From Swiss-Prot:
The keyword Cell membrane applies. The gene is goe. It is found in: Cell membrane. It comes from the Eukaryota. Glycans are attached at N180, N539, N701, N853. The chain crosses the membrane at residues 128-148. This is Protein gone early. Plays a role in the ovary in limiting the number of primordial germ cells (PGCs) that develop directly into gametes, allowing them instead to enter the developmental pathway that produces germline stem cells (GSCs) from PGCs and ensuring lifelong production of gametes from these GSCs. Negatively regulates epidermal growth factor receptor (Egfr) signaling. In late third larval instar ovaries, detected in germ cells but not in somatic intermingled cells and is expressed uniformly in the wing disk. In the embryo, expressed in the ventral midline, tracheal placodes, and cells forming the anterior-most row in each segment. GO terms for cellular component: plasma membrane. Residues 162-878 form the Peptidase M13 domain. One of its GO terms (biological process) is oogenesis. It comes from Drosophila melanogaster (Fruit fly).
Length: 879
């Protein structure tokens, strides 16, 4: 057998063993006596080849027969066998054979070499496949290692438990209904909070019906009236004279107004005008020869409850024990604010008002030329009244809110028949010249007296007749109602007519508020709710009241702390207000003792008679009933009667009101049983809604507290702390706004500026109270003044769970508060009227669009809660 070693042909596969061409051969025969090392020069062509090299680099064997190849293979096998039989194994002779560590390394690398040899023995395509797979696996392993090393921490809100209760889902639905959380709260704040508000209004049943501004308040009012309409429809048929029948009868009579035709309306108007001894514009009148305005004013006030020059009410006095006292203030005018009688007034509103006056006269049969004169005379006479009042208020040092004997007031204002009016309005009360009354502004009474004494009978007669007709117009036939709606278009913007069910539901609520709330708060309904919810612990009414108590004490405590920081209030005044807050109590709805008396409600409305043929005639009887309730307040009342009187004898009963007589916060149960508030809603949502409502009711009465302090203290001058307190820094609040806005804010009435101050102060205080409330829950500490077992109460109300709500899972308490509060200022106006500019003059409240921007700019908590930049400086005169 011949193996051609001299013709060694290197190939690509020879690299597997070229790196170790030097080796040692151990002579088995000389192994005992000594080892002869034979070292070959690495890379020489004479170096013996290994077995694998021999296999890979032998000649193609064209001159070798298969028999020669087989013989060579057999020789190799025999050689190996012989070495094994003789106890000797051929060993490679290497320079490092004497070092065991090197041999160990070679032994370790030997399996890798064999794997590599096996890989090289494969075909090229299979080698590429295996190498690619190995690279991909290595890359995948590297990616996994990098992901494990740099994987971000899972946010808390994704790990926090999610609340899936019905109330949590409902609160989320309410917030997401108007919000567009895909927008940036820092750069697109309104779109973030109210992005879907306008589109929801466009799809609402109230679309183009609400006059002026559709906002959160009007949205809730619509929901309330809609529920009341359904409630009235479900009232059972009761016997004649019951409260249920009175409510149903009033509602039906209101719905039937459309059957009244113009001739009947003319007859009703003329009958009412004859009751005030005629109108000089009628041709058949006696041309005012025997007409006496003092006698007419007494009839107009006592019979119809209309107060054209001075207004009579019964309010709380400023001296302890804050008993009721007859109060006199300036009277009513045709336009909503004195601004509209100025030289720079809104021309569209003035033109609409004159058109209303003119069309009324024409409908009453007055020819066009005289109707135009009538309109001009009324407007200019009302302007004279405004000018006299403003001149009287020019002196900032004049006395206000002064108790005066009627004899002294008669000397001050001899042309006003005040004594005669009071004797007619309160016939069961002894009214004499020694009776003391509270006069809001004695100088205004004097100015009005001068005006009457210097006016002719004709403008006085026109003004009194118009005051009577203006109150009747909305309840007459369609021809007269259209006149009032046309003026509303000039004032609020062009809208559709209110649906009749909405008007009548509002009439029932405003005229019979105690009956409506009492029927909705019947004990049988509560007992049924308690029985059905007993197995689940607290029912909604109980839970709402318990949480509201905690919120009230938390808000009160924060309000006291905010007062401590109000250095713009004198220390003695701050202490007085804090004392009032410490002694304040809380009342939910009508007392249970009242509802448990089966005859209380019937006796309350015993004097109300609604048996008239036409709805407009109810006006007189409703006023007679209200007048009797006012007179009862002048006598001794039981505590239950005082609570009912404080809640329902106001001109506009509020769901949350403060009683100066009782130093008590009154919260309607209708409100706390609605979807506006629920103890299972997130705490932040409740603080942003009903929490700010409570604070606004309290802060709004701080001016009254200061008047009480003025009356009871001799250390404070008559510098009218109410005015200083209620006036915010207009220049600061309007910083960064157009100059026109600064001018408009300075032109606002004190009531409008006061509401602005109240809104901002309430929001800031509520945000701080929320933080303290949440910290108290986390720490398990009690709310100061609440007097509760905090551990059981917090657990029963579910306050310790701190669950996230669906759809807003990433929002913490502060962000939820911000979103909920900002949505209270969502609004949209009628397209053809810039109502935002005149809203403060019409409603004594700033437009919601401005309040939205002002609260975001001047309440630092709101932008900071959403990680937005906030102004560091704060405006003065804010809590």
């Amino acid at each position: 057998m011949a193996i051609n070693q001299g013709k060694y042909k290197p190939s690509i596969c020879a690299i597997d063993e070229v790196d170790d061409r030097s080796f040692k051969l151990h002579n088995s025969q000389d192994e005992i006596g000594g080892k002869q090392q034979l070292q070959q020069i690495e890379g020489s062509e004479t170096a013996p080849l290994t077995t694998n090299q021999q296999k890979l680099h032998m000649d193609d064997g064209s001159h070798l027969t298969p028999k020669d190849l087989e013989a060579a293979r057999q020789d190799a096998l025999n050689e190996v066998a012989a070495g094994g039989a003789g106890g000797r194994t051929p060993a490679a002779i290497t320079p490092n054979s004497t070092h065991p560590s090197a041999n160990g390394l070679r032994a370790l690398l030997l399996p890798g070499r064999r794997s590599f040899d096996a890989l090289m023995s494969l075909s090229r395509k299979r080698r590429i496949l295996y190498v690619t797979t190995a690279c991909l696996c290595a890359l995948l392993l590297l990616i996994i290692i990098l992901l494990l090393a740099f994987w971000p921490e899972v946010p808390f809100y994704l790990r926090a438990p999610l609340c899936l209760d019905k109330e949590c889902v409902e609160s989320s639905r309410q917030l997401l209904l108007w919000a567009n959380t895909s927008k940036s709260p820092c750069h697109e704040t309104y779109e973030w909070a109210c992005g879907n508000f306008a589109s929801d209004y466009a799809n609402h049943e109230y679309f183009v019906i609400k006059r002026g501004e559709w906002n959160y308040e009007t949205y809730n009012e619509y929901q309330e009236l809609n529920e009341l309409n359904r409630f009235i429809a479900m009232l059972p048929n009761s016997q004649e004279g019951s409260v249920e029948s009175t409510v149903s009868s009033l509602y039906r009579s209101c719905r039937e107004t459309d059957v009244l035709d113009k001739s009947q309306s003319d007859l009703l108007l003329k009958r009412a005008i004859n009751a005030v001894y005629g109108w000089q514009a009628f041709r058949d009148s006696n041309r005012l020869q025997s007409w006496e305005y003092k006698r007419v004013l007494v009839v107009l006030q006592a019979k119809h409850g209309i107060f054209p020059y001075y207004r009579v009410t019964v309010e709380n006095g400023f001296s302890n024990p804050h008993d009721y006292v007859i109060t006199l203030d300036e009277g009513e005018l045709g336009l909503p604010d004195k601004y509209f009688y100025g030289n720079d007034a809104d021309e569209e509103v003035v033109r609409g008002y004159k058109l209303l006056l003119r069309d009324f006269a024409i409908n009453m049969g007055i020819v066009s030329r005289e109707a135009d004169l009538f309109a001009d005379d009324i407007f200019h006479y009302e302007r004279r009244i405004v000018n006299h009042i403003e001149d009287a208020k020019a002196d900032a040092n004049r006395p206000i809110n002064k108790l005066m004997r009627l004899a002294d007031l008669k000397i001050k204002a001899p042309s006003l028949p005040i004594l005669e009016s009071l004797q007619a309005i309160f016939p069961k009360t002894k009214i004499t010249e020694d009776t003391e009354v509270l006069v809001r502004d004695p100088e205004v009474m004097h100015a009005l007296s001068v005006l009457l004494s210097t006016s002719d009978k004709k403008p006085i007669n026109n003004f009194i007749v118009w005051s009577l007709a203006r109150k009747m117009l909305p309840h007459l036939s369609k021809e007269y109602r259209t006149l009032a709606e046309t003026f509303d278009h000039a004032l609020y913007g062009r809208t559709a007519s209110y649906p009749r069910w909405l008007i009548c539901s509002k009439v029932v609520r405003d005229w019979l508020p105690f009956a409506v709330d009492a029927l909705q708060q019947q004990p049988p309904r509560q007992q049924f709710e308690t029985m059905t919810s007993k197995s689940r612990g607290l029912n909604k009414t109980q839970g709402n009241e318990e949480l509201l108590k905690l919120m009230f004490f938390s808000l009160r405590n924060q309000l006291k702390d905010s007062l401590e920081q109000a250095k713009w209030l004198e220390p003695a005044a701050r202490q007085f207000i804090q004392k009032k807050l410490n002694e304040m109590r809380l009342q939910f709805g009508i007392p249970d003792e009242v509802l448990q008396q089966p005859t209380y409600l019937a006796q309350y409305y015993n004097e109300l008679i609604l048996n008239n043929v036409f709805f407009v005639e109810h006006l007189e009887w409703i006023w007679t009933f209200r007048r009797s309730q006012m007179e009862k307040k002048l006598g001794p009342l039981a505590i239950l009667d005082v609570i009912v009187s404080e809640m329902y004898t106001r001109d506009n009963p509020q769901a949350i009101a403060y009683s100066n007589k009782l130093n008590m916060l009154l919260v309607s149960k209708v409100l706390i049983s609605s979807n506006y508030y629920d103890y299972r809603y997130p705490v932040a949502v409740n603080f942003a809604r009903i929490g700010t409502d409570i604070l606004e009711a309290l802060i709004d009465n701080f001016s009254t507290f200061l008047l009480q302090f003025n009356t009871q203290s001799t250390d404070i001058s008559d510098a009218a702390p109410e005015i200083r307190y209620a006036q915010p820094d207009v220049n600061c609040l309007a910083a960064g706004q157009p100059p026109r806005l600064v001018h408009e804010l300075n032109e606002l009435s004190s009531n409008a500026l006061k509401s602005f101050h109240v809104t901002l102060s309430a929001a800031r205080t509520a945000a701080r109270a929320l933080s303290n409330f949440v910290n108290a829950i986390d720490a398990g500490s009690a709310i100061q003044g609440s007097g509760i077992d905090q551990a059981n109460t917090y657990e029963a109300l579910g306050l310790t769970r701190r669950l996230r709500i669906p759809g807003l899972r990433s929002f913490n308490e502060n962000e939820l508060f911000t979103l909920s509060y900002m949505q209270q200022h969502c609004s949209t106006t009628i397209a053809d009227k810039d109502y935002a500019r005149i809203k403060p003059l019409v409603e004594s409240q700033l437009a919601e669009s401005y309040l939205f921007n002002a609260t975001w700019q001047h309440i630092q908590f709101l932008p900071r809660s959403t990680n937005c930049a906030a102004a560091e400086a704060t405006c003065s005169n804010l809590l």
